[in-house]
Amino acid sequence: MNVNHNDNRPMTEEEEDRLPVLLPVLADIDGAGKTLFIGNAVAANDAALLLNNGITSTMNLAVNIEMPPLALGDGSVVRRTHIGLIDGPGNIAHHLLGAVLVLHGIINQQSPGKAHYPPHRAGNVLVHCRGGRSRSAGTIALYLHLARPERFPDFEDVLLHVRSCRGLDETQPQPAMLDLCRQALAIWNRSAENGQVLLR
């Protein structure tokens, strides 16, 4: 949790949401050196910050926020993906599972380049929503548990890892998001071959 240096108290969410938040969650997420980051919408729109951290793809999970195109200082363009989840009740587990599968695609997508595509290069990946506390944290935790079970065999343990990386307490992700994660996990575990074929 960030601290307000004027009076040494924890920042409110509103105060934190005015500042860029960008934190690594797992290095070498793809076996080829990419790092997965968690952050907020302010960070996702900060070209210098993204360039300095090697981030070339962002995934926006906020249903109510549209991110504009963004060029980096090296001439490449950030590849944007948007899967809009509601911040609280109202989502279904299949939508969250869709976000997990799309994140897997973003992480492993190649960037061969075409003449009619904006210039892009492979790089690190940022998952964000408005504040990067609930939707992003829950989606990343579920993704790591499903895609990297050898590293994160237990969902509750990976949740602690993501909370630690982001500086969250037990109130985040929100209860509705945690319930959604557990519903999605139950659906995944009922599917053929426990769904593992989808993330290989």
Question: What kind of region is each of these model predictions?
Answer:
Residues E170-R200:
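Charged C-terminal helix
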